[in-house]
Curated annotation (Swiss-Prot):
It catalyses: L-cysteine + L-glutamate + ATP = gamma-L-glutamyl-L-cysteine + ADP + phosphate + H(+). One of its GO terms (molecular function) is ATP binding. Pfam families: Glu_cys_ligase. GO terms for biological process: glutathione biosynthetic process. This is Glutamate--cysteine ligase. Transmembrane segments: none annotated. SUPFAM superfamilies: Glutamine synthetase/guanido kinase. The gene is gshA.
Amino acid sequence: MTDFAARLKQVASNPEVFKQFGRGVERETLRYRQDGHLATTPHPEGLGSAFTNKWITTDFSESLLEFITPVSHEIPELMGQLKDIHHFTQTKMGEEKMWPLSMPCYVGSEDDIQLAQYGSSNSAKMKTLYREGLKRRYGSLMQIISGVHFNFSFPESFWDALHGEQDEEARQDTKSDAYFALIRNYYRFGWMIPYFFGASPALCGSFIQGRETDLPFEKIGGTLFLPKATSLRLSDLGYTNSAQSVLKIGFNSIDQYLDGLSDAIRRPSEEFAEIGVKVDGEYRQLNSNILQIENELYAPIRPKRVTKSGEKPSEALQRGGVEYIEVRSLDVNPFSAVGVSEEQVRFLDLFLTWAALSDSDPMDNCELECWRDNWNKVIVSGREKGLMLQIGCQGERLSLQDWAHRVFADLRQIAVEMDSAAGGNAYQAVCDKLESWIDEPELTISGQLLELTKEHGGLGKVGCALGMKFREENLAHSYEQYSADAMETEVATSLEKQKQAEQSDTLSFDDFLEDYFAYLKQ
């Protein structure tokens, strides 16, 4: 019996483990107008305060909505919450719709992309200033690419099954070590996520005007595409950050990770210093370091812990260890009215469990770069049959198809146990469906979307057609987990909380920022 099989057997000895995963979704979507152009209106009043509403906020721009579900332990509950949030939001948007694709709708100029506004409190102004810094550093277009983040945690019963009873400190160390082992395996094998679920093989030609690229794009009308691409969102054209390539952040332990993050947050950037921080009395960015704050670190997966008030993400990890992980490699699913499907969630259950139960040796920077090369190959040409990927840095290679089939042999073992615990065969059905996609790349989401793009004569037309369909679907939805009253109560509560935040400030904005960044001088 392999180590993986032995660990799976230990965990499966308590079937309740598989019913207790913690899951949450954060979904981003642009508001757009009837004509397919980006909406330039403020955040809809009926949604309350984007600063304090726990379900509905904004990301980079006023027009970039972000929906956040609480932690759920049942997939139907999670999907129901997400559908309820979409339904309520659409009822407050008038004729505007939600863009169903990761790559943006038509944007006339970067000036149309208005920074998200959160009110007049110091914390709110800091959020907008951070976005001003992002705009000046990378341009606004890159910042309105939409994605889906999937938050995931194992229950205490999972750790009990593998490690028996432990005191609090030992359990905390066990969890952190195991989540970092999972993260290393995610870097090794997570390219399967863009292979199956990448949904950005094409983009609007205006998106790369003035940007240099070596990619051999083909054209349909105003749309540029790569015939075998899966996720241009994850490529150098999308939401990545070349300025961060000098950073060496390791994933072998929580201490190594936090040391790397601490260095990154303090490292100055000559390029960003040229922008200036406060010029003629106006702030341009929070500071001129490579990262203004920790959130600027680009990563396809992050170790996380819920923060206390005023606490930075790294301080929360230092205090209590890793509590959950955030998967950040999902494009918006263009075939789901809520941007993600139940099948995707089930696959992630399987894949993340496999990544945690499989062997995961320490990884140096050289090896990490080799795995990143595999990701880049899959992102740009993943649907090319026979695509060869590297096995570490030793020069060995294996085809994407062979490698994926090998992983699925393990995933199927997990699926049997999960289905046995839950009743039914939902997990095995997901394995059946996705494994067929390994040998038929045209069935993947990027393959299907590119085919639609060709049929419609461009990406914008596909986006508008799907957006209209999903608007009707979301409006027709009946509440499953929440109610209109619960949503309206949260709107009112959020407005009150924003007001309280604005009334409780005692410092000037200058002093507030100096106080916040005092830790950089330590």
